[in-house]
Amino acid sequence: MPRVVFIDEQSGEYAVDAQDGQSLMEVATQNGVPGIVAECGGSCVCATCRIEIEDAWVEIVGEANPDENDLLQSTGEPMTAGTRLSCQVFIDPSMDGLIVRVPLPA
């Protein structure tokens, strides 16, 4: 079972177990990680589950798909190679130890 560490600058670290195939949004909301609002429930239409994948994990997690990228760009927030929507990142065994930053609310 992969372990994921969510880091929230206000609340601290949350190290939680995840199931293969779960989205990071599901993992975060099921474990009470603050900052993942997920208003649309994972439909990739609201961008309220925005996260930053730590640099060392970007290649393993992969890039945003075109729809996700368009939605992220529409927010006007600065983006990095690790900017993703947690509803669009699905856990697999290679992600054991994944570190995810949850941005402060705007």
Curated annotation (Swiss-Prot):
Cystine connections: none
Organism of origin: Pseudomonas sp
GO CC terms in record: cytosol
Cofactor note: Binds 1 [2Fe-2S] cluster.
Keyword annotations of the record: 2Fe-2S, Electron transport, Iron, Iron-sulfur, Metal-binding, Transport
Taxonomy, superkingdom: Bacteria
Gene Ontology BP annotations: P450-containing electron transport chain
Domain 2Fe-2S ferredoxin-type: 2-106
Biological role: The oxidation of alpha-terpineol by cytochrome p450-TERP requires the participation of a flavoprotein, terpredoxin reductase, and an iron-sulfur protein, terpredoxin, to mediate the transfer of electrons from NADH to P450 for oxygen activation.
Needed cofactors: [2Fe-2S] cluster
UniProt-recorded Gene Ontology molecular function terms: 2 iron, 2 sulfur cluster binding; electron transfer activity; metal ion binding
Family matches, as CDD domains: fer2 (cd00207)
UniProt: [2Fe-2S] cluster binding residues: 40, 46, 49, 87
A matching Pfam family: Fer2
Protein name as it appears in the record: Terpredoxin
Protein family according to the UniProt entry: Belongs to the adrenodoxin/putidaredoxin family.
InterPro entries: 2Fe-2S_ferredoxin-like_sf (IPR036010), 2Fe-2S_ferredoxin-type (IPR001041), Adrenodoxin-like (IPR001055), Adrenodoxin_Fe-S_BS (IPR018298), Beta-grasp_dom_sf (IPR012675)
Gene, per the UniProt record: terPB
Keyword NAD among UniProt keywords: no
